[in-house]
Amino acid sequence: MIIYFAVITCSLKLCRSYYKMLLNVSHTIQCVFSRMSWYTLAVILSTLVTIHASQGPEKFTLATAIVLKRGEDITWSVSRENLKYNYRTVVDTTSKAFAVWHTAGLNFRFVYNYSEAMIRISFKRRFHGEIGYDFDGLGSLLAHAYLPNQGDLSSEIHLDNDEIFSFSMKDSDYEGDNAPTSYFWTVLHEIGHSLGVQHSASPSSIMYGWYKSRSFGNGTIVLPKDDANAIHQLYFSNTKQYAAIPKFEKNKVVTTTPVPPADRSESTTNTTITTCFSFDSLSEIKHDATKDSISAYCAGVYDAISYVRGDLYVFVGDLHWRFDTSGMLHNGYPQPTGATWRLPSGSQVNSVFEWMQYIVIQTGKRYNLFVGTDFVRSVNFKVAPSITFASNNRVYAAFLGKLKDITGHLLRRKNLRWRYLPPIQLLQNELRAATDILVASNGMYIFKSGVHGVVVNGVVEHYKLNKGVWSNCR
């Protein structure tokens, strides 16, 4: 049976000891989305939206509701391929992790036939067929898991085979600064993702946004109420639609379904989105950045702004800031852009966007194509576009206030005529002064110096300051 997986993934970079607990994380990730009802379990939900369970104490978010036949077992298996640990030890420890989730009312069953299992667990190294989701060797990135298919359950959990996992379930084996990484706690968290549960804002939750080796106690692990409630909503209530699963990293949480920050009272179509951004203060950021770039960023004046691999990137001068969708600045940022991507010396970043398998960085007349951070090639234009962005696998550039489709030119096709887009009001009135366009999951944003506006039916109704929304320096 061929299983088609959602392209949405979640990954786990786990902190091996107590990381500097960014105390406001439980507040920054709470977001509100409208409820959408459906009257039969047979309906497969296809639209993913973000919600926060604000009607009670729950702090979890979920993926699309799963349809299981009554009494159906969720099967799982472990691959022997590349396995450097004792197979029986891995299976036994994994079975104990599934037993914890079983207490929420789900039935799990181990099967030897790996290809027939609903949840398949395997060990991988470095690049393993997933662009943008490579493992990184020993340390940092430990595992990632696929979101279940919409409407049914089929998922994979990959663990980094370069890591050194401990299968011990004794607290004394995880004490000290050089404590090993617990396979049990790692796979327990990833199973939650493979079942469709996103991160929780509750520190006591198994699905909390940072890894920590918890106490095994007397060997009986109790599923926290927050996680049990998530399973109940996902498998037994099926009354809501939920969000995609985030990556889970060592010092931050990264969601693969980006939702740009919006004003608390702002509505788009039939859905009200509230995204609560809380940024680290500049005094807590260690870097050698120039004062001009920092000042411009804090004033909300950007050279380019874009979502790349689910993270929000803001480019100012020779620096770039990288944020997850809970609004947390990634550890170690801002960073010099030239230290991440090999760009021409002294070049100015004008636009950044994802297109096909590439990350494309426009520097004047030149388009630099990267796979990850590896330079592939460049494409040069005679005239430098003012802004460039990608939408629906097409690339558009603004020349003198007019948008042109330049997809074919990036593909180096010859004798291709540039196609003008329809002259909607946005293109006529806004593009000449625009500094960038951001295409997000819930709409399009146009940026000018220090301000941004939401594009609705080709028209920007009003502009708001970037300061305090897309950047917030305290």
Curated annotation (Swiss-Prot):
Zn(2+) binds at H189, H193, H199. The active site is at E190. PANTHER family: MATRIX METALLOPROTEINASE, MATRIX METALLOPROTEINASE 1, ISOFORM C-RELATED. GO terms for molecular function: metalloendopeptidase activity; zinc ion binding. Residues 1-17 form the signal peptide. Its EC number is 3.4.24.-. The keyword Metal-binding applies. Binds 1 zinc ion per subunit. GO terms for biological process: collagen catabolic process; extracellular matrix organization; proteolysis. Gene3D superfamilies: Collagenase (Catalytic Domain), Hemopexin-like domain. Pfam families: Peptidase_M10. Keywords: Hydrolase, Metal-binding, Metalloprotease, Protease, Signal, Zinc, Zymogen. Hemopexin repeats lie at residues 299-344. The keyword Signal applies. SMART domains: ZnMc. GO terms for cellular component: extracellular space. This is Putative matrix metalloproteinase.
